A protein has these predicted regions:
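Glycine-rich phosphate/ribose-binding loops and adjacent secondary-structure elements
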Residues: 1, 188-283
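A general structural detector for well-ordered alpha-helical segments in enzyme core domains, enriched
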Residues: 129-134, 168-183, 208-212, 240-248, ...
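Non-catalytic, usually N-terminal nucleic-acid engagement modules in DNA/RNA processing proteins
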Residues: 1-180
Length: 283
């Protein structure tokens, strides 16, 4: 008989890994909870000793074989319409209140041309509809949401650039600025926001930071609540350490105010060790 291994209890002062929930995986949970509404393809394929899919749902601390209270879910994978019941979204929407969900915004979908619209045009209706949907969805399902940032490399892909209307580095910056201002006003009262930093090299990363840092400052009555490290900021150790020093000296990594720093797209084991060491040093 398999014995529960509580991974939440084993987490102490390590950098927290966020398992990214895929819509396919979540569908299996929903199919088991609502068999009359969702077709399951699991059948008899569960390994011996695993009674059901709920045993594989780490957000269910009662039934999971390996409870783990932290997760990441992306707007790019989700059904964001919270006005309707969607069984395959129940793993996320129906999670226990003692879990923690970080919601990615879908900026990657914009950068790949999957969410078309004239994102450089602040009056574009398609972009505004998606903008509103993302912040409402984040406010409804997450503890932390990320800003709807547009990566600076977006314009380098001609097809994606044409689909999303981002033609230059400055277009990406200006569109993200507008998105940030909108999120600042439209977010739900309980949603915390991570200010995502982008940039394909040190020069772009520094410029982006200087432009966006105000959203985490006391310039606003309710500033953003932490940082998302994207682009070069998530993979360049020199830049990461330099940025941390700058944040500390500028009062933008304050306990109780900027308590979360997320590194986008980072899951290699060596980075788990490195980020744990950095986290302990900062603390």
């Amino acid at each position: 008989m398999l014995v529960q291994d509580n991974l939440t209890d084993k987490q102490s002062d390590y950098a927290i890994f966020l398992p990214a929930i895929s819509s396919f995986y979540a569908t299996y949970i929903g199919a088991e909870r609502y068999p009359d509404k969702v077709k399951s393809i699991i059948g008899d394929r569960l390994p011996k000793g695993i009674p059901n899919m709920e045993a594989m749902n780490w957000l269910n601390k009662q039934e999971a074989l390996f409870p783990y209270k932290w997760s990441l879910y992306s707007a790019g994978h989700a059904n964001m319409d919270l006005t309707v019941h969607v069984p395959k979204e129940d793993m996320v929407r129906g999670r226990s209140a003692d879990t923690l969900m970080v919601a990615d915004s879908g900026g990657f979908q914009i950068a790949k041309g999957v969410w078309p619209g004239a994102w450089a045009d602040t009056k574009d209706k398609a972009a505004q509809k998606k903008r509103e949907a993302v912040i409402k969805w984040q406010s409804g399902i997450a503890n932390y949401g990320m800003t709807l940032d547009i990566p600076t490399w977006t314009y380098l892909d001609p097809k994606a650039s044409e689909a999303c209307g981002i033609k230059s580095y400055q277009d990406a910056v200006d569109a993200t600025l507008f998105n940030n201002e909108f999120f600042m006003e439209a977010r739900g009262k309980d949603l915390k926001i991570l200010n995502v930093l982008q940039g394909s090299n040190h020069t772009e990363a520094d410029s982006w930071y200087d432009t966006m840092k105000k959203f985490c400052s006391d310039k606003y009555d309710k500033p953003f609540d932490g940082w998302g490290m994207g682009g070069q900021n998530m993979c360049d150790l020199h830049l990461i350490l330099r940025r941390l020093v700058t944040l500390i000296h500028e009062g933008l990594l304050e306990k109780g105010q900027h308590d979360w720093m997320h590194f986008l797209g980072t899951s290699k084991l060596e980075w788990a060790l490195l980020l744990t060491d950095i986290q302990r040093s900062v603390r």
